[in-house]
Amino acid sequence: MKKRINTTSFLICFLFIIGCYQEGKAKKQPSFDTISENVYFKNAKDNITLAGTLSLPGKRGRFPAVILISGNGKNNRNEEFGSHKPFLDVSNYLTRNGFAVFRFDKRGVGESEGDFDSANSFDFAEDVRAALNYLLTRKDIQKNNIGLIGHSEGGLIASIVASSSPNIAFIVSLAGPSIAGDKILLHQQKALAKMRGLDDSSIEISQKANQGAFEIVKKYTNDLVLKSKMVEYIQGIARNDPDKPKNMTYDEYVNAQVTGILKPWMVNFLRFKPEDYIKHIKCPVLALNGSKDLQVLAKENLPEWERILKESGNTNVTIKELPNLNHLFQTSNTGLPKEYKEINESFSPIAMKEMTSWMKYTLNR
């Protein structure tokens, strides 16, 4: 028998699924023969200082470099979740293969200044530009060979930066979105619900409820009007919700739902159209997705990366779906988020080899 799910309670849970797996302490990782330097750099536009780590191969010289851009959530420089530090693993792998790697705490996280809660993807893109500007001052970095590796929202941020930065040598998108934000979330909701065994009727009801809320966000750009319309909408679908927590009043419940969907990041994401930026990218692009990614679906996003770039005249694009990998590029049984912390693997060696081989080939053409 398939499960049923309540429409309204599903809305708020679903909206936060992308960024709710960053908590927890990580296990100590082995060190490798690399040179790592703690770095503080300035985002002059927003007047904040950001903190990161620059890792270099353990030898003298000038090196090609990559900036690692994390996905949604309060991520530190290692994109830490549970016992895992995937960006540390990626950094170690890439430095052993001759790349300098720059990773940093998101604004308002770790040692970085700034307000995380009020920031959106464009703000995070400014932070990446600041990281790029810092690398351009380094004598040990090949200024013409600096690329971006973005995971999830980080892939979206990479497209924003590269669309207006001619000195980006390449982009690697790791489960980065190429379709509109509202569609990303609707596809995500449906895929997760099906994998959890929910019945088709409940899925359809939830899809319509979420789509209605998303359309309000896209239609009304005045903040006061938007909030008024959203409150009215949520009141309509929450009034008879049997899953309302007993310790919350009806008004508190509605307010929690409205607050969730009207967070600055969420509003920006729902209105965001990646194509507006991807079509301006002129550098080589590698787009990777796992076949068991239930958050940014490979079949919906990989073909769009290729279509948009080629239609805009950039034929230097490679797309690849990697078998059995989830949204975090772990080898997975189901792809469900509940597995993320339970899997021993932090980041698939197959995925690391795939992007490293492509980067070496791209820079040596």
Model-predicted regions and their roles:
Residues K25-G61:
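N-terminal cap/lid segment of alpha/beta-hydrolase-fold proteins
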Residues D89-E111:
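Conserved alpha/beta-hydrolase
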Residues S118-K139:
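Alpha/beta-hydrolase active-site loop
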Residues Y134-D199:
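Primarily recognizes the serine-hydrolase "nucleophile elbow" in alpha/beta-hydrolase
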Residues L174-H280:
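Accessory cap/linker subdomain of secreted extracellular hydrolases
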